[in-house]
């Protein structure tokens, strides 16, 4: 692994003669106080930082699994960590990401970034449920999800429950079929959520009226 702290280049170190000059320049800037343009740049930077913090605070992250994995290379086995992370805003957007790194923190950070790249928009009803029954499959895992009445809660387990909760679904029934692997189950749940359509979209695809859907 490479050293994260690069060595300092001797040419980059300022000489003793340059230090007083730099200090005088800083004192002149303090006396002048800077122009209005500098103040505007500072305010704009603070506003940008505040907006970025608000955007980051909208998303919730949950680690589903962390495993130590190995890769056989020419020199032997290379050990690393794999993190499965679910990212969602509890308002109809959710994603599943996988990250690998030499440490746990780096793996989780990569998993969060990967999850935000694979977001799925989920249509929610007034009772925070899903409009229709749906199923999804990934590998040997299969997941069946169906809408539920208000007050039912999230009847699911494992990584499927995490995906449904971070999507903002509060009343739903889910059934896991096949493999018990957390990653396959989470991705199967994502496939099921991605295939959901509202009643209006379903009526438009079938070429019928919305009243015929409810009848």
From Swiss-Prot:
Give Gene Ontology CC terms. Answer: small ribosomal subunit
SUPFAM superfamilies reported in the protein's UniProt record? dsRNA-binding domain-like, Ribosomal protein S5 domain 2-like
Q: Which UniProt keywords apply?
A: Ribonucleoprotein, Ribosomal protein, RNA-binding, rRNA-binding
**Bias (Polar residues) ranges:** 1-12
Q: Where is this region: Disordered?
A: 1-62
Q: Name one GO molecular function term.
A: rRNA binding
Superkingdom, taxonomy of origin: Bacteria
Query: Which PROSITE patterns does the entry mention?
Result: RIBOSOMAL_S5, S5_DSRBD
The record's section on Gene3D superfamilies has:
3.30.160.20, 3.30.230.10
Q: Where is the composition biased (Basic and acidic residues)?
A: 27-61
- Tell me any Pfam family this protein matches: Ribosomal_S5
Present the record's domain note.
Answer: The N-terminal domain interacts with the head of the 30S subunit; the C-terminal domain interacts with the body and contacts protein S4. The interaction surface between S4 and S5 is involved in control of translational fidelity.
Which NCBIfam families would you find in this protein's record?
rpsE_bact
What does it do? Answer: With S4 and S12 plays an important role in translational accuracy. Located at the back of the 30S subunit body where it stabilizes the conformation of the head with respect to the body.
Protein name according to UniProt: Small ribosomal subunit protein uS5
């Amino acid at each position: 692994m490479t050293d994260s702290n690069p060595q300092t280049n001797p040419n980059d170190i300022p000489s003793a003669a340059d230090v007083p000059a730099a200090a005088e320049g800083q004192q002149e800037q303090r006396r002048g106080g800077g122009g209005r343009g500098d103040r505007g740049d500072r305010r704009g930077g603070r506003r940008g930082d505040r907006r970025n913090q608000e955007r980051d605070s909208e998303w919730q992250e949950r680690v589903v699994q962390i495993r130590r994995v190995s890769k056989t290379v020419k020199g032997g086995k290379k050990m690393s960590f794999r993190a499965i992370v679910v990212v969602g805003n509890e308002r109809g957007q959710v994603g599943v990401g996988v990250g690998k790194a030499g440490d746990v923190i780096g793996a989780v950070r990569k998993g969060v970034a990967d999850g935000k790249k694979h977001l799925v928009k989920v249509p929610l009803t007034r009772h925070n449920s899903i409009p229709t029954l749906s199923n999804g499959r990934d590998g040997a895992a299969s997941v069946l999800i169906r809408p539920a009445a208000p007050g039912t809660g999230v009847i699911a387990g494992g990584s499927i429950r995490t995906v449904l909760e971070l999507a903002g679904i509060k009343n739903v029934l889910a059934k896991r079929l096949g493999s018990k692997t957390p990653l396959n189950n989470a991705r199967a749940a994502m496939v099921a959520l991605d295939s959901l359509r509202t009643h209006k979209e379903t009526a438009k695809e079938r070429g019928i009226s919305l009243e015929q859907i409810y009848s």
